[in-house]
Every structure is written in structure tokens, then in C-alpha cells.
């Protein structure tokens, strides 16, 4: 499999914006992209930084910093999650917004790319403090969001309750209920059936398609999953039901291994009761770093960025890597995995189940008509299977790896839209 040549220096390796830009640049060169379009697509259209006060429970006033980056909206409203974490940076949000542009284009849904975040430690904040912070953040960016401008969604440390607060705040400002300003909402206020497990379901679909493409069988296929949150746990549960053997679960505080397969339903119940997978008796405690490089057919990084780097890429033994997380593989590691001929389903395809289901939710909200879960799942799987075929055919036709093919396909679609619309000036 040809390498991507998407080079960055070692000290830039874990900067997500540098990594994304390196991949974009290489794909754009392969496309012979017009220099003007290259400039348009490489740069975010809008970057919003807000600093705002929040009254804490003890009477103190704390200042918080929030971001919303809208990378490109040529194909439709911006679309992307909002994350709450102490380590959120503008570069991270900028990269994630760009990935959303390419992700939406790869699966051919009518959204552009956006992302948001607030620098905060949710573990040290009460529910009331989180609500006040969320509502104030929403009010600070309210002129730039909306069903036809930029649609928000859950991400790291945010959930359907966060989306309900954002939707309510926006609606109060508009003077009427606007459910379609966010996706990932509770069902009773315009959420969609099937949305919660959609990203995990999409990961399973991409694993199925990878095995089909490589003429490998599901039976006996050993899988290691890094991360057991929403994406990882749902992917594990659905894949276990399909006949995959989930032999390893790697989490931040430790991992689990069972060569005969982990009982995923029991593990989900155990984590729900205890808040951790540590201590689960149905598997052997194993350092997470060891699990990433253990023997398996499929490795699914499904938690955070920069999990596969130059430090461990040469030790990866998996035949297939399906990226359930955003940016789990650095550009430097990409080169190493390509040399090892590891089949990669890149993040902008592998975890696109979430944004695809979000698109369905947005459509249902705007129609005021809601689908059965079976319809959501059927439509989701059809789009993701077709998108897999699009990417691998593009890779074969252009003699590039899957990641660069996905970027090229996405860039080509967005660039074509811009050329059709023209530059307003």
C-alpha cells in the first residue's frame, strides 16, 4: 500500500492542526487542486473565541474561555460537537472542525464542518454550574449558530442534557422552540431514535466492510478496543452480537484481556455499577499500552487523539485499524502503518455514523416527523457501506492509501461545490 508522505516534524506530531494540515496538503497536491481553492479550504472560515463569567455555587465568579470554529459551510450549515475539557485548545478545535468538513463530505451529507469547546474541568463542577456555563457559552456564540447556520452536538464530557440546555437557551432568545439547533437531544424534545449508538454502529459497519474487502471472516476475528465510552462500548456490544471476539478493552486507567473473548454485556453492566472497568473478573488486568500492540485482527482506537504515534506504531500487530475516535493516529505514525501494510479505515469515515445520525435527527426535526429506529439504522448502514466503497475505489484508482483517498474524495466534493457557487467578492 503506498504511503501518504504527509510529513510533520516529531515535535509537531501530536498537534492535531498540524497533522490535519499535513494530510490535507498531500491530498490537495494529489488532486492538483487550484491554488485559490487550496487557500480557501485550508483555512477555517470563522474562529470565535469568547471569555465569559459564570457564578459558581459558592458565590465566586469564574471566567471561562470557549471556542467555536466554523471551517467551511459551502455544502450546508456547520456541524460539529462541543467538548468540555481542561486541555481544550484552539488548534484542537480548529482541527476537529476541519475533520468535520471532510467527514460530512465523505459520507455526502449536506453539512459543513464546525466544532466547539470550553476550557473547564467538569469533574469539579456541579450540575448547576455546568448548566450556567453552558447557557452563557450559548448566549456568547448565539449570533453564529442556528439550524441553517451551525448545528451543535455532544462531544467529550457533553451529552443530551447539555444539548437540551443549549436548545432551550437558543429558543428563549428566538422567542419560540427551535429543536434543530442541536442534535443528540433527549427523545422527548426532538431527539432521534438510534442516535446514541450510531457512532458505534458505524464502526461495526466499517469493520464488516473491511473484512469483506479483505476476504476475512467475522468468526474468530479478534478485536481490541481502546476506550469504553459511548463509541467503544456500543461498538463492542454490537460487534459481539455479530460474532466478533472482543479480546481486549483498553481504558485510561487500565485494560482488560481475555483470549476467549470478554462478555461485553457483563462488562457494560459492571462499568455502569462501578464507574470503571477496573476489577472486572471476566478478564485479566493488562496495561492498556500492551493491549494496543497485542495480537488481534482489528484494533479500534475509540477514545482520544494521538493514541497511535511514532512511539508505538511499529509494534502494532493488528491487520486492520478502524478509527472510532477523531485523530487517534498521528501523521508520522501513518507512515509507519502504511509501510507495515496495515489496512486503515480513517476517522473521517470510520466514526461518521454519529454525524450521519445527527443529519437524520436534523431532518426529522425540520419535518416534524420521526422515524422508527429500524429505519434510522437501515439508512445509516446504507450510507456508510456506500461511503466505504467510494473510498476504497478512490484509493485503488489513485494509488493512495485509504486516508488520503478519503481526504481527496472529500476535498474534491467541497471544491466542486465552491466552484459551482463561485467566490462572492
Enumerate the predicted regions with their spans:
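Glycine-rich, N-terminal phosphate-binding loop and its surrounding beta-alpha-beta segment
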Residues: 50-122
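General beta-strand structural signal in soluble alpha/beta enzymes
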Residues: 95, 152-153, 176-182, 248-251, ...
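Short, Gly/Pro- and small/polar-rich lid/capping loops
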Residues: 8-51
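Glycine-rich phosphate/diphosphate-binding loop of Rossmann-like nucleotide-binding domains
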Residues: 191-295
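Adenosine-phosphate binding glycine-rich loop
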Residues: 10-15, 210-211, 315-425
Amino acid at each position: 500500500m503506498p504511503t501518504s508522505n504527509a510529513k510533520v516534524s516529531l515535535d509537531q506530531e501530536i498537534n492535531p492542526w498540524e497533522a490535519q494540515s499535513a494530510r490535507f496538503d498531500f491530498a490537495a497536491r494529489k488532486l492538483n487542486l487550484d491554488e485559490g481553492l487550496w487557500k480557501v479550504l485550508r483555512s477555517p472560515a470563522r474562529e470565535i473565541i469568547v471569555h465569559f463569567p459564570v457564578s459558581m455555587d459558592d458565590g465566586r465568579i469564574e471566567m471561562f474561555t470557549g471556542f467555536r470554529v466554523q471551517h467551511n459551510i459551502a455544502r450546508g450549515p456547520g456541524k460539529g460537537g462541543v467538548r468540555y475539557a481542561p486541555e481544550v485548545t484552539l488548534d484542537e478545535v480548529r482541527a476537529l472542525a476541519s475533520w468535520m468538513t471532510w467527514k460530512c463530505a465523505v459520507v455526502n451529507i449536506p453539512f459543513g464542518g464546525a466544532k466547539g469547546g470550553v476550557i473547564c474541568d467538569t469533574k469539579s463542577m456541579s450540575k448547576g454550574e455546568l448548566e450556567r456555563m453552558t447557557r452563557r457559552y450559548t448566549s456568547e456564540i448565539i449570533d453564529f449558530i442556528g439550524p441553517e447556520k451551525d448545528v451543535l452536538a455532544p462531544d467529550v464530557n457533553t451529552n443530551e442534557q447539555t444539548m437540551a440546555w443549549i436548545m432551550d437557551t437558543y429558543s428563549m432568545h428566538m422567542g419560540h422552540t427551535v429543536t434543530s439547533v442541536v442534535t443528540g437531544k433527549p427523545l422527548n424534545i426532538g431527539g432521534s431514535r438510534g442516535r446514541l449508538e450510531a457512532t458505534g454502529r458505524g464502526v461495526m459497519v466499517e469493520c464488516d466492510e473491511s473484512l469483506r474487502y479483505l476476504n476475512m471472516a467475522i468468526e474468530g476475528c479478534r478485536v481490541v478496543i481502546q476506550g469504553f465510552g459511548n463509541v467503544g462500548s456500543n461498538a463492542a456490544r454490537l460487534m459481539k452480537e455479530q460474532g466478533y471476539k472482543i479480546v481486549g478493552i483498553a481504558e485510561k486507567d487500565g485494560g482488560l484481556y481475555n483470549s476467549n473473548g470478554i462478555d461485553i454485556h457483563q462488562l457494560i453492566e459492571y462499568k455502569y455499577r462501578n464507574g470503571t472497568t477496573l476489577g472486572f473478573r471476566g478478564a485479566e488486568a493488562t496495561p492498556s499500552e500492551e493491549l494496543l500492540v497485542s495480537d488481534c485482527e482489528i484494533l479500534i482506537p475509540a477514545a482520544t487523539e494521538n493514541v497511535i504515534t511514532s512511539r508505538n506504531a511499529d509494534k502494532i500487530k493488528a491487520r486492520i485499524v478502524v478509527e472510532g475516535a477523531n485523530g487517534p493516529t498521528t501523521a508520522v505514525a501513518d507512515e509507519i502503518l502504511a509501510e507495515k501494510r496495515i489496512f486503515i479505515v480513517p476517522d473521517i469515515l470510520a466514526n461518521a455514523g454519529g454525524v450521519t445520525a445527527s443529519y437524520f435527527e436534523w431532518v426529522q426535526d425540520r419535518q416534524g416527523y420521526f422515524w422508527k429506529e429500524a429505519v434510522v439504522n437501515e439508512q445509516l448502514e446504507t450510507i456508510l457501506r456506500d461511503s466505504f466503497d467510494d473510498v476504497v475505489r478512490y484509493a485503488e484508482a489513485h494509488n493512495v492509501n485509504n486516508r488520503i483517498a478519503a481526504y481527496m474524495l472529500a476535498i474534491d466534493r467541497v471544491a466542486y461545490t465552491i466552484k459551482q457557487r463561485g467566490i462572492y467578492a
